[in-house]
């Protein structure tokens, strides 16, 4: 084998036939550098991946799973706890609708004897007005207080005061039709005294004259007569003026009533009732002795003479 054949370069790839030997060498060197750089990159990426996997603790995955499950369970328990709090929490303030809650109606089983009842009375044509009201008071057993009236009447008999001082009153019979201007009075059923019943009327004539007085005879209605009145069940008969003894008795009775009311409200016993009776007897004998036992509110409402108030000094305790 000659020297020429021994000096030939090693075999080469067919894809490098078009390259110059110098360029071929550079191309091979570049490929080697690229392959070496690719190996380095692969090694670096693998090292980073291993380092990252090493940095991540497996326990963290389990704890993270637990943490992820814990909020869910916490949400459920929180929801349950919230529901329990909503059920067991005591409401504060006024209940809804309690302010506007309808109150039960007040039912009065019977009327009070001292209550006033209003009446509108219509007297038919041709009837006696005074007689009709008197019969109504007697049958209903109620006192009647006439407030006003309107309509027309005929053939009126009234009593007028004397025009001359000291002279007797005169009775006047009025014939014809008269318009009622004013009507007032009261009617009490028996056994009330007759003086407690009476009717006063003022009339206007056809020519403009005005006449009035106390009705002492028939008062015939000329057409419907409407009367506005009030009725009552009880009436206390008082004789005025009051005497001094009566005033003292009424004062003692008022104090005794206040004491009775306080004892009744406090649930007094029979012993308290006897004590109150003894106090009433003592008050009747010596009116000045009850001053020391009165509270200030009663002292303000009771009017006493000077000698009764300053009669005896307050005893020392």
From Swiss-Prot:
One of its GO terms (cellular component) is nucleus. PROSITE patterns: PPC (PS51742). Keywords: DNA-binding, Flowering, Nucleus, Transcription, Transcription regulation. Its main location: nucleus. Residues 89-101 bind DNA. It holds the Pfam family PCC. Residues 22-41, 48-106, 258-285 are annotated as: Disordered. SUPFAM superfamilies: AF0104/ALDC/Ptd012-like. GO terms for biological process: flower development; photomorphogenesis; skotomorphogenesis; vegetative to reproductive phase transition of meristem. Residues 72-84 have a biased composition (Gly residues). Disruption phenotype: Slightly longer hypocotyls. It comes from the Eukaryota. GO terms for molecular function: histone deacetylase binding; minor groove of adenine-thymine-rich DNA binding. It is found in: Nucleus. InterPro entries: AHL15-29 (IPR014476), PPC_dom (IPR005175). Residues 113-253 form the PPC domain. Residues 48-64 have a biased composition (Basic and acidic residues). Expressed at the hypocotyl-root transition zone and the root hair zone. Also detected in the inflorescence. Residues 26-35, 270-282 have a biased composition (Low complexity). Signal peptide: none annotated. Gene3D superfamilies: Hypothetical protein, similar to alpha- acetolactate decarboxylase, domain 2. Homodimer. Interacts with HDA1/HDA19, HDA6 and HDA9. Transcription factor that specifically binds AT-rich DNA sequences related to the nuclear matrix attachment regions (MARs). Binds an AT-rich DNA sequences in the FLOWERING LOCUS T (FT) promoter. Acts redundantly with AHL18, AHL27 and AHL29 in the regulation of flowering and regulation of the hypocotyl elongation. Plays a role in both photo- and skotomorphogenesis. Acts as a chromatin remodeling factor that modifies the architecture of FLOWERING LOCUS T (FT) chromatin by modulating both H3 acetylation and methylation leading to the regulation of FT expression during flowering induction. The PPC domain mediates interactions between AHL proteins. This is AT-hook motif nuclear-localized protein 22. It comes from Arabidopsis thaliana. The gene is AHL22.
């Amino acid at each position: 084998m000659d020297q020429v054949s021994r000096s030939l370069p090693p075999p080469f790839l067919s894809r490098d036939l078009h390259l110059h030997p110098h360029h071929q060498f550079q191309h091979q060197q570049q490929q080697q550098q690229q392959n070496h750089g690719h190996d380095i990159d692969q090694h670096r990426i693998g090292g980073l991946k291993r380092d990252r996997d090493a940095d991540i603790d497996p326990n963290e995955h389990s704890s993270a799973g637990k943490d992820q499950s814990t909020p869910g369970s916490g949400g459920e328990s929180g929801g349950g706890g919230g529901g329990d709090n909503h059920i067991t929490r005591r409401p504060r303030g006024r209940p809804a609708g309690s302010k506007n809650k309808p109150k039960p109606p007040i039912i009065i089983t019977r009327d009070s004897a001292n209550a006033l009842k209003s009446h509108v009375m219509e007297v038919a044509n041709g009837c006696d007005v005074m007689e009709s009201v008197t019969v109504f008071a007697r049958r209903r057993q109620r006192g009647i207080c006439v407030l006003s009236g309107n309509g027309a009447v005929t053939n009126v008999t009234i009593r007028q005061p004397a025009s001359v001082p000291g002279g007797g009153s005169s009775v006047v019979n009025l014939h014809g039709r008269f318009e009622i201007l004013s009507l007032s009075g009261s009617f009490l059923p028996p056994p009330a005294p007759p003086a407690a019943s009476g009717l006063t009327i003022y009339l206007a004539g056809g020519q403009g004259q005005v006449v009035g007085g106390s009705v002492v005879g028939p008062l015939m209605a000329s057409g419907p007569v409407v009367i506005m009145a009030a009725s009552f069940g009880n009436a206390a008969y008082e004789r005025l003026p009051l005497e001094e003894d009566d005033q003292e008795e009424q004062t003692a009775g008022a104090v005794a009533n206040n004491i009775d009311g306080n004892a009744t409200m406090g649930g007094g016993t029979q012993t308290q009732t006897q004590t109150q009776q003894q106090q009433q007897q003592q008050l009747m004998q010596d009116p000045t002795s009850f001053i020391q036992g009165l509270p200030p509110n009663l002292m303000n409402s009771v009017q006493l003479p000077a000698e009764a108030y300053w009669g005896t000094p307050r005893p020392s305790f």
